[in-house]
């Protein structure tokens, strides 16, 4: 591997990291939302 490629790869990794964080956050939010909806559904069905 050439040093140039390594730096490019590192840059790409650094760019990917925040995106991954965002992805995790959105997934957690979606899960929370689904849970809330389910709770609501249970309440209305009671």
Curated annotation (Swiss-Prot):
User: Its function?
Assistant: Seems to play a role in virus replication.
Question: Could you tell me what this protein is called?
Answer: Replication-associated protein
Q: Which organism is it from?
A: Potato leafroll virus (strain Potato/Netherlands/Wageningen/1989)
